[in-house]
UniProtKB/Swiss-Prot annotation:
Pfam families: ADH_N (PF08240), ADH_zinc_N (PF00107). It comes from Naja naja (Indian cobra). Its EC number is 1.1.1.1. It is found in: Cytoplasm. It catalyses: a primary alcohol + NAD(+) = an aldehyde + NADH + H(+); a secondary alcohol + NAD(+) = a ketone + NADH + H(+). This is Alcohol dehydrogenase 1. Its main location: cytoplasm.
Length: 375
């Protein structure tokens, strides 16, 4: 009944930096050709959304943020064959067109149709589907899920198991997949290896789960908040250390803990250049691999001693855990349904959508791992 019509609904809008999101009534236009309109039913509050609000991640405002979600297809535009109305779906901030070099290479996963690099805040045709008070509102990284309805390109949505609980599998849209894949897909952690995970938030805990699933013999959690250690050990960390407890740099501490060898794999899941260097220099000088998972602020630059690379270390970045989104998300949902991994321990708070700013307060204060908002 709503197909082909403008839908009026609630959305949380970021009008300006460092201000609470504002719940407004917006108009959501019908999907154009090759686009899909989705009724969002559950969405997670992620640090990347907070980076936009704080100005660390520069994006055009006003904007509907949110990118980790699950919902049901309301209607589709002309030419869409991958989903139909009524399908349960997850929006994809890392799209998969299947045609570009990254999509066609077995090594790649960052499709050229992504809006991560350009940050245009618009649909592929250069326009928006959102308006509020007569003003055009920007989209966020091909998704925009802090709204009852959103419109995405068909490259940015995938159908999932209809029996999946959306309030849990929404985490597969970003946080869980990013961390789990960093270990399984990007680093390709080997059985018996030693891993160090810097940052034990939701994504960091998902890295821990990935390291455990890959068969790592030691998984060392690193965080300055010792309150996170019990949960990290529950998820698979074999030991946890607080850099503030030591007089020497944390990379030296990790060398001491590994008989002077360094770790096989390290993961920076904070988004700070200082910890990226610490994680990198914690690795075995020749065999070690360090993966940057945390999103750094726009203006950050890294200075390091190139001899650290010369000896043979590998330094890698990773987006969405290295997964090809359309290929991997349905399989990850199926794996969850088959109890191959758990998501419940990552979800510390479930709130109604109207309490979205409370969700961000919990994130900023370090009191939550993941807050899921329910519509």
């Amino acid at each position: 009944s709503t197909a082909g019509k403008v839908i009026k609904c609630k959305a949380a809008i970021a009008w300006e930096l460092n201000k609470p999101l504002s719940i407004e009534q917006i108009e959501v236009a019908p999907p154009k050709a090759h686009e899909v309109r989705i009724k969002i039913l559950a969405t997670g509050v992620c640090r990347s959304d907070e980076h936009v609000i704080s100005g660390a991640f520069r994006m055009p405002l006003p904007m509907v943020l949110g990118h980790e979600a699950a919902g049901v297809v309301e209607s589709v535009g002309e030419g869409v064959t991958c989903v139909k109305p009524g399908d349960k779906v997850i929006p994809l901030f890392a799209p998969q067109c299947g045609k570009c070099r990254a999509c066609q290479s077995p090594k790649g996963n960052l499709c050229t149709s992504n809006d991560l690099n350009s940050g245009s805040g618009l649909m592929p045709d250069g326009t928006s589907r959102f308006t509020c008070k007569g003003k055009s509102i920007h989209h966020f990284i091909s998704t925009s899920t802090f709204t009852e309805y959103t419109v995405v390109h068909e490259n940015s949505v995938v159908k999932i198991d209809p029996s999946a609980p959306l309030e849990k599998v929404c985490l597969i849209g970003c946080g869980f997949s990013t961390g789990y894949g960093a270990a399984m897909q990007t680093a390709k952690v080997e059985p018996g290896s030693i891993c160090a995970v810097f940052g034990l938030g939701g994504v960091g805990l998902s890295v821990v789960m990935g390291c455990k699933a890959a068969g790592a013999s030691r998984i060392i959690g690193v965080d300055i908040n010792k309150d996170k250690f019990a949960k990290a050990k529950e998820m698979g960390a074999t030991e946890c250390i607080n850099p503030l407890d030591f007089k020497k740099p944390i990379n030296e501490v990790l060398f001491d803990l590994t008989g002077g060898e360094g770790v096989d794999y390290s993961f920076e899941v904070i988004g700070r250049t200082e910890t990226m260097i610490s994680a990198f220099t914690s690795c075995h000088q020749n065999l070690g691999t360090s993966v940057v998972v945390g999103v750094p602020p726009n203006a950050s630059m890294i200075t390091y001693n190139p001899l650290m690379l010369f000896t043979g270390r590998t330094w890698k970045g990773c987006v969405f855990g290295g997964w090809k989104s359309k290929d991997s998300v349905p399989k990850l949902v199926s794996d969850f349904m088959q109890k191959k991994f758990v998501l419940d321990p990552l979800i510390t708070h479930t709130l109604p959508f109207e309490k979205i700013n409370e969700g961000f307060d919990l994130l900023r204060s370090g009191k939550s791992i993941r807050t899921v908002l329910i519509f």
